[in-house]
């Protein structure tokens, strides 16, 4: 896993953004958060982001998480995206992965599990990039 991975959190809940950002920063990751899909997509276009944590229900955006995921794929088809939701179930998790997410985490989430999934996603992304380069 490469150093200096920048993680983007897109969630309309300020407390969740701060909690996740703090957790990631404590584990040595750099993170930014945006409260709307539109702001998150703009940042993704202008900055090198290694992974996106994306809420499914973005109440203050034009797009929900699934629509935002599709737009992320138009910007970067390979970036790992982990969907997060407080209203999730197995169907939501499966739907997230079918639509191109790397993984799914349900709120409230266990911090250790979230960090594990982030590390795994970044490791797999790095391996995939190495295979493409070689």
Model regions: which residues?
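C-terminal output helix
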Residues: 89-91, 105-118
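Active-site beta3 strand of CheY-like receiver
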Residues: 47-58
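Short amphipathic alpha-helix used as the core "switch/output" element in two-component signaling
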Residues: 42, 64-78, 95
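Two-component/phosphorelay signaling modules centered on CheY-like receiver
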Residues: 2, 14-32, 38
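His-Asp phosphorelay/catalytic-motif detector in bacterial-type signaling
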Residues: 4, 48-50, 74-80
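Flexible nucleotide-interacting loop at or near the entrance of a catalytic core
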Residues: 113-134
